[in-house]
């Protein structure tokens, strides 16, 4: 028989202290299969009225609702809640409050590297890979398991320059610029140098834990990391393999 409730744990972080609540989600009817975001919204309405979390589109478009569910990053608006699920903030970024993490330091890595945005004509002639990369919703789930992002320890909330090392998201943005037909040839060298300065080389030895496909279906190894490694170190790799 289907139950009318789901029992979940929500981990909260406030004032540098962590705590957790056991929350019993009340289904609207026994057949309901709520998303984790539905659970958070009900918990906020009925139990913890200042529970903090982010959401926007509720349709896998904006990427801001990402939380860890049982230790793995998921979009809360798209993940079905199950009995005994544990919901916590993304482990890869510093917590601001409850389930809200500080996101802006990641994009700060790329300040000054989108000089061509004003010339954008939507690139209807660009190849398929370019358009695949525009599908990134910036959910930051790809930080999980990244050997480079792990080096950014300690993750400091108040230091805007706390992330000297890159991650699949940053490299995706650089690769998209690199293959953008509007990027002048003379700027491509700067893009590769930026990728190198963020530690791209680490992936030559260690990217086995990197997610292959992200949540919106971008193949991070084939469409982002491999082509960047090829552009940055293609000669050396070929020589090594001879
Ligand atoms: S709320 Fe926009 S992706 Fe989940």
Task: Give the positions of each predicted feature.
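Iron-sulfur-associated redox domains of electron-transfer enzymes in respiratory
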Residues: 2-103, 143, 147, 152-155, ...
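Ferredoxin-type iron-sulfur electron-transfer modules in oxidoreductases and energy-metabolism complexes
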Residues: 34-46, 90-91, 95-242
């Amino acid at each position: 028989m289907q139950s009318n409730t789901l029992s979940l744990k929500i981990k909260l972080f406030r004032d540098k202290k962590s705590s957790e609540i056991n929350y019993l989600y009340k289904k609207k009817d026994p057949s309901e299969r709520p998303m984790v975001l539905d659970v958070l919204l009900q918990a906020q309405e009925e139990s913890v009225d200042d529970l903090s979390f982010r959401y926007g589109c509720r349709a896998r478009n904006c990427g801001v609702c990402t939380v860890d569910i049982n230790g793995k990053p998921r979009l809360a608006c798209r993940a079905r809640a199950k009995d005994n699920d544990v919901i916590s903030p993304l482990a890869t970024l510093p917590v601001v409050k409850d389930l809200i993490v500080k996101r802006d330091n990641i994009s700060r890595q790329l300040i000054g590297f989108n000089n061509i945005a004003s010339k954008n004509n939507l690139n209807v002639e660009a190849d398929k890979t370019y358009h695949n990369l525009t599908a990134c919703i910036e959910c930051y789930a790809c930080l999980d398991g990244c050997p480079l992002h792990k080096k950014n320890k300690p993750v400091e909330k108040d230091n805007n320059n706390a992330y000297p090392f890159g991650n699949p998201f940053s490299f995706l943005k650089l690769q998209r610029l690199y293959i953008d037909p509007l990027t002048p040839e003379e700027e491509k060298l700067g893009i590769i140098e930026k990728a190198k300065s963020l530690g791209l080389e680490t992936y030559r030895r260690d990217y086995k834990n990197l997610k292959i496909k992200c949540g919106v279906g971008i193949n991070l190894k084939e469409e982002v990391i491999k082509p960047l490694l090829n552009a940055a170190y293609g000669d050396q790799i070929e020589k090594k393999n001879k």
